[in-house]
Amino acid sequence: FLSLIPHAISAISAIANHL
């Protein structure tokens, strides 16, 4: 699970950056 956290943060960051 912990290995998924950086990917989730990356995805959220990309979405936030797109907004």
Curated annotation (Swiss-Prot):
Tissue expression summary: Expressed by the skin glands.
GO cellular component terms attached to this protein's record: extracellular region
Keywords, sorted A to Z: Amidation, Amphibian defense peptide, Antimicrobial, Secreted
Compartments, record wording: Secreted
PTM sites of type Leucine amide: 19
BP terms from Gene Ontology: defense response
Superkingdom of origin: Eukaryota
Aminoacyl-tRNA synthetase among keywords: no
Function: Has antimicrobial activity.
Family from the record: Belongs to the frog skin active peptide (FSAP) family. Phylloseptin subfamily.
Record-given protein name: Phylloseptin-J6
